Design a protein with these regions (language model features):
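Asp-based, Mg2+/Mn2+-dependent phosphohydrolase catalytic module
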Residues: 67-68, 75-156
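Short, acidic loop-to-helix structural element flanking the phosphoryl-transfer center
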Residues: 30-61, 100
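A short acidic, helix-capping loop that chelates divalent metal ions and anchors anionic groups
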Residues: 1-4, 70-72
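A general structural signal for well-ordered alpha-helical segments in protein cores
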Residues: 11-15, 71, 103
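A metal-dependent, Asp-based hydrolase signature
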Residues: 2-32
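Secondary-structure boundary motif
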Residues: 20, 24, 52-55, 108, ...
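Generic structural signal for small/hydrophobic residues in well-ordered secondary structure
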Residues: 7-8, 53, 62, 87, ...
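A mid-sequence interfacial segment
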Residues: 48-84
Length: 156
């Protein structure tokens, strides 16, 4: 089954399960499941930090477990994605964090040195994986602390 069909199957299965559990919310559930990507909002302070990092000369990359079409829709809607120099999207690459190969692919594709990379993620498993390929990592379960962490690492 290809990615799109698998994703649509999963979305239908989840939608059906939620509607079975909360039948009185069926219309709301269907609408949210159809438009969930539009409900995602960036953390404004973190967007400012991305701009600051670019001004300081840092290259910025994404490793994301986004579905490809969701990523593409989000990319069109959010102009701050242009701040990134490259992206590894799991659905496109058929790899998913914390598989070490996804981090290695980033390094290889963009000719990066692991010991010069800092990876930030909300999952400790993903941070451990990045460290296994030689990157430094910041575990950030609370995105509001990004500025504080970057200061502690003497980046800003």
């Amino acid at each position: 089954m290809d990615q799109t069909r698998r994703r649509n199957h999963h979305k239908r299965r989840v939608t059906k399960k939620l509607i079975n559990e909360y039948p009185e919310l069926a219309l709301d559930i269907e609408e949210i499941m159809e438009k969930w990507i539009e409900l995602l909002l960036p953390i404004e302070n973190n967007i400012k930090l991305l701009s600051l990092l670019k001004e300081k000369g840092y290259s910025l990359y994404i490793i994301s477990n986004f579905h490809l079409d969701a990523y593409n829709r989000f990319l069109k809607k959010q102009d701050w994605f242009t701040l990134f120099d490259g992206a590894i999207i799991s659905a496109k690459e058929k790899l998913i964090k914390p598989d070490l190969r996804i981090y290695e692919l980033l390094l290889e594709r963009y000719q990066l040195k692991a010991d010069e990379c800092l990876f930030i993620d909300d999952s400790l498993n993903n941070i451990n994986a990045c460290k296994n390929v030689g990157m430094d990592g910041i575990h950030l379960p609370d995105n509001s602390k990004l500025e504080e962490e970057l200061k502690e690492h003497h980046i800003i």
